[in-house]
């Protein structure tokens, strides 16, 4: 890729992306379920094998068979790592320049304020070699650099391109076009340890729809996944809604897993949130 602008900037970068994906439909009686998995990397020798991707897809599909709804309740919720990155996406949207200068963000005027628990650190690593979101400059030619966005749970900075920065009377953060290798630091627990810590709860493996109010932070999304009782997976779940407010969801994060998903530009482990509403039967 080559970028050149009339203001005198000329830069280039070379990138590659390799991938293997698999989608499977499974059936049991009249019930049918679908799931998928994929591997992605900059270099082909860093990909999982086609066999491993296929086996994981099959196992994920089979565990969904026999899914049912659960009664409406309020329980701890684990967002599986590939799904947990969506929470960070909602956060980034709320601190992005466009939402801020339009005053259409539930995190308006939160700079320097506590947004997450004090163990949470969220940062950019744009110069990480081999990572999926690495870039030495943004889409306006502004140099990127590692920086903390959240430290000790406190919001340290916004996500700005040059136009939104001018509107806010601030400096660009080198984020025209988005964030680069956004990372939430992992804790010590893996997904299995999180599951074992829960007496009754819900592991979200798929989200459906986009019921997000960016102004108020109200959150409501269709979901499917696995029900947890006494620290073990009990049965698959479908046709439920996970609801809350994003401010509360961020503050009520209990743990961030060490099962980091590195297949995209957001690098995130599973996230355990206390006390979300599951709307079911």
Place the predicted regions along the sequence by residue.
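Dual-mode signal for accessory low-complexity, basic/Gly-rich regions
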Residues: 43, 108-281
């Amino acid at each position: 890729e080559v970028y050149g602008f009339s203001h005198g900037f000329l830069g280039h970068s070379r990138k590659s992306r390799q991938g293997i994906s698999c989608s499977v439909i499974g059936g049991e009686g009249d019930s049918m379920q679908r799931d998928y998995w994929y591997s992605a990397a900059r270099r082909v020798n860093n990909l999982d094998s086609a066999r491993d991707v296929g086996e994981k897809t099959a196992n994920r599909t089979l565990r969904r068979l026999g899914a049912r709804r659960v009664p409406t309740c309020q329980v701890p919720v684990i967002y599986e790592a590939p799904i947990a990155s969506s929470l960070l996406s909602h956060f980034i949207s709320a601190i992005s320049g466009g939402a801020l200068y339009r005053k259409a963000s539930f995190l308006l005027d939160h700079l320097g304020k506590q947004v997450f628990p004090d163990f949470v650190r969220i940062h950019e690593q744009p110069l990480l070699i081999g990572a999926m979101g690495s870039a030495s400059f943004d889409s306006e030619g502004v140099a990127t650099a590692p920086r903390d966005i959240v430290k000790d749970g406190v919001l340290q900075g916004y996500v700005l391109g040059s136009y939104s920065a001018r509107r806010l009377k601030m400096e660009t953060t080198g984020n025209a076009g988005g964030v680069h290798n956004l990372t939430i630091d992992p804790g010590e627990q893996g997904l299995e340890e999180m599951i074992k810590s829960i007496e009754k709860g819900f592991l979200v493996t798929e989200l459906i729809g986009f019921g997000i109010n960016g102004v108020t932070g109200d959150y409501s999304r269709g979901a499917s996944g696995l029900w947890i009782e006494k620290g073990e997976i009990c049965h698959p779940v479908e046709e439920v809604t996970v609801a809350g407010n994003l401010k509360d969801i961020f503050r009520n994060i209990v743990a961030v897993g060490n099962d980091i998903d590195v297949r995209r530009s957001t690098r995130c482990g599973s996230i355990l949130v206390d006390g979300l509403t599951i709307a079911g039967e």
